[in-house]
Amino acid sequence: MLQDMDAAEIDYVVVQSQYRRTHEACVEHNNQLLTLVRRWPQRVIGFAVLQPMVGAQALDELRRCLDNGIRGVGELNPYAQGFAINHPDFLRLVETCIAYDVPLSLHVSEEVGRYYLGKSTTPLRHYYWLACRYPELKLILAHWGGGLFFYELMPGVRKALRNVWYDTAASPLLYPTGEIFEVALRCVDHHKLLFGSDYPLILFPRRQMEPDLHSFREQVKQLPLPAEIRAAVLGGNAAHLLKLDVVSESTMPAPGESNARAEQPAVQPTTVEAPVHGFMAVAMVAEHWPQTRAVFERYGIPWRDSPVPFWEPIVQAAAARGYGPTEQRRLLDELNAAIT
């Protein structure tokens, strides 16, 4: 890897892991990564891999890694690792990342197109929900965020995703390099783009036998971009995000600080008050008042997030199923009766 870095004129590399399903596998990988970081501290930056569903163990492992020089978390994959983005254990991990001011990198796949190994089914709206819920989180969405960046053309979405970065990992396997950069730079500020490779994945299988870091980087260097944008995308943005351009030690907890923060951060609930009204989101009502789920089911309105966006209001869901104003009022009456 160091030889490939030198050939591509890369100073630092961020090493992330495959998404491990067990806590033990995460710890094993993190130990290997810490060995690399200690041996080449001026070349290798490590991101910890964690299994959020083990709860406090994952938080303890994160603190151990941060205390020993790890600079972020990822790449995590909700689909492959078996956790929901709104699960309390994952949200505690998110809040710990916020407390330590370290970025979190998540695997994202485009929702259309061909199937390939590693393509996940987590909807883009789940990542959008996370960014809305935690605007202070430094969130990296891998693989161009599955195309989520396009929606930043909408001013409200751009504001909601202001603390989201998109990396370019594996880009040549999905998109022509010139076209994807042209589109992305029309949608988002160039400071939100991070050069990623997915090394040691072979990005040009028709002409490569071995992986390298040079080929894709050279494609980006040849794009007709202003020099300052090219430099930012190829490294400057990542250096700023990881605070390599300031005092590096300032982002790490002082020795012993993690012990003082050892308690689990409480997941802050969204404030919801009765009574239910027609413009409350179906999924939100069902989450906060489980007793309303049977009412939704009687009306044939799905409340689980898999088929229903978290933002869909009750009146829209009811109207889409043919319920007029009278039935909608009866639905609201039954929902409110269920929670009293």
Model-identified regions with their sequence ranges:
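Catalytic pocket-lining loop regions of alpha/beta-barrel enzymes
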Residues: 70-72, 82-195, 255
